[in-house]
Amino acid sequence: MTPNKPTLHPRNRHQGRYDFPSLIKAHPDLARFTITNPHGKPSIDFANPEAVRVFNRALLKAQYGIQHWDIPADYLCPPIPGRADYIHVAADLLADDNAGDVPRGAQVRALDIGVGANCIYPLLGYSDYRWRFLGSDIDPVALASAKAIVQANGLGKAITLRQQANRAHILSGLLQEGERFDLTLCNPPFHASRDEATRGSQRKWKNLGKQDPKRKLPVLNFGGQNNELWCEGGEIRFVTQLIGESVQYAERVLWFTSLVSKASNLPGIEAALKKSGAKAVRIIEMGQGQKQSRMVAWSFLDDAARQAWHAQRKSQA
C-alpha cells in the first residue's frame, strides 16, 4: 500500500513516502508496529487498528506538534493526509475571495460538523493556519474523547466543542445567537444503512486480506461507530439536509462545505443547491491515493459581499 500520491495538495505535509525513522524518533512505540512491505520499504499493517492509531499518533507528533492523541476503541481512525487535503482545499476557497491570500489566525472561525472522537480537522486546521474551531457531534462519547485531546494539548482557547442535542438536526439549534463562521466542514456518513456499511467494511477487509467474520461491524478504514459510517438515506440525504438547514444561516456563514464521496450523488446535491438559492457554488475534485473525492462548497453571499466579509475581519484583527 502506497499511502501518498502526488495528487495531494501542494501544501500538504505528507508528500512522498512516510519518513519512518523520523516518525519513530517522535514516537518510539511505532517501532513495534513497523514492518517491511513487499517492496522492501518500512510500513505498518494498515488493517491493524492499533497499529494505525499509533501511526497517527506519531504523524501528529512529528508533523503537527500534537503531543497527545488517542481515541476509544472502535471509533474512526482517520487517514491524516486525506483529512489535511480537505483543510488546504478549503483554505484555498477562502483565499479566492481574499486577493489570493489564505486567511490565517484566530480571527478565522470554522465549524466542523461531526468532529468525531479524533478531532482531526480542528487539530490540522489550527496547526496549519491557527484557525479557531467549533466542533459539533451528536455522540457524547466522541465529544468526551475530543475534549480530552483538546485539553491534553492545551488548545482550549482554539477549539470549542458542542453537542447537537437533536439527532434529527445538523445546524438547527446548534449555533448560538450572533455566531459567525468563515467556513463549515463536514465529512458526512457514507452509507445508507447498517447492512450497507457492513458490506462495504467486509469488501475493504477482503481487499486487505483481513476479513473477520466474528465482527458485527468490521473495521472500515480503521474503525467507526454506526453514526460515523451510516445514516438513514446515506450521504445524499445528509448533504441535502445540510443544504436545506444552511439557508437559515445564510448571512452568518461565508462558505458552507462538505466532502462528497460518491460522484453519483452530485446531480441531486446540485439540484438542492439550486433550490436553496445559493449565489456561489464550487465543486472541487480531490484525489488522495486510490480514493477520489470532492469538496462541494456553497455561499449565499455574492462576490462583493464575500470580499467585504474578509475586509471586515481584517479591520477587526
From Swiss-Prot:
rRNA processing keyword on record: yes
Catalytic activity entry: adenosine(1618) in 23S rRNA + S-adenosyl-L-methionine = N(6)-methyladenosine(1618) in 23S rRNA + S-adenosyl-L-homocysteine + H(+)
Superkingdom of origin: Bacteria
Keywords recorded for this protein, A-Z: Cytoplasm, Methyltransferase, rRNA processing, S-adenosyl-L-methionine, Transferase
CDD domains associated with the record: AdoMet_MTases
Primary localization: cytoplasm
GO molecular function per UniProt: 23S rRNA (adenine(1618)-N(6))-methyltransferase activity
Stated name of the protein: Ribosomal RNA large subunit methyltransferase F
Organism: Pseudomonas putida (strain ATCC 47054 / DSM 6125 / CFBP 8728 / NCIMB 11950 / KT2440)
Gene for this chain: rlmF
